[in-house]
Amino acid sequence: MEKSRRALIVRGGWDGHQPVETTSEFIPFLEQNGFELRIADGTAVYADTDYLATVDLIVQVNTMSSIEPEEFAGLQAAVLCGTGLAGWHGGIADSYRANAEYLHMIGGQFAHHAGKDPTQRTGEQSDNYLSYTVHISERGKSHPITRGIDDFDLETEQYWVLSDEYNDVLATTTQEVRPWDAWNRPVTSPAIWTRDWGSGRIFVSAPGHRVEVVQDPNVRTIIERGLLWAAR
């Protein structure tokens, strides 16, 4: 009998990103693909290096949180040795702002999401929901995560991501110029990317603000494929 692979879901941080609800969307998929699951509410599990060495995939949704040095050391060591790391939105790209080594490993950090016209804002999260297009890159057209998916539109937060050239960018999105914003030319950021780190694979989807976003057929397919791609 083939041995099951192990997946660890680490969720927590800001409740506005619905870490429990969004990760729960993918539990049946992981189980159907033969993963034995463990769920951790927070980062303490990362300090258990013996356990992490047995994990094939970490799914992290933990926004605007912090991580202790021994916890990050455990996470980093696991990825370097081949454990896959995957996540979406601020749960992976805005997790531990004070840890430069984490940002280096992930390859992207949320910096901004543009808002609606100030005269139309109501003080709700939807003030930051814009209609925009996710453009599949040339690399993305042939990558197993995004192959066969055309450019698609979303209405949700549009992440401006600070990143580097080491990422394999599978899709992008462009922040347009509007009269009330500070920038004066369009800015293109990665929306979907992967990154090899040691023997491990990292997958990041910037879209994924709330359940309704990960339920979008294109986003769901990309995340599901990304989880399988990242796993050892």
Which residues are covered by each model-predicted region?
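A glycine-rich, often tryptophan-bearing local segment used as a flexible ligand/cofactor-contacting loop or short
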Residues: 66-144
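Non-transmembrane alpha-helical segments in soluble domains
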Residues: 27, 76, 103, 146, ...
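Oxidoreductase and adenylate-handling cofactor-binding alpha/beta cores
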Residues: 102-109, 151-168, 218-232
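Catalytic beta-strand/loop cores that center a nucleophilic Ser/Cys/Thr
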Residues: 30-31, 38, 54, 122-198
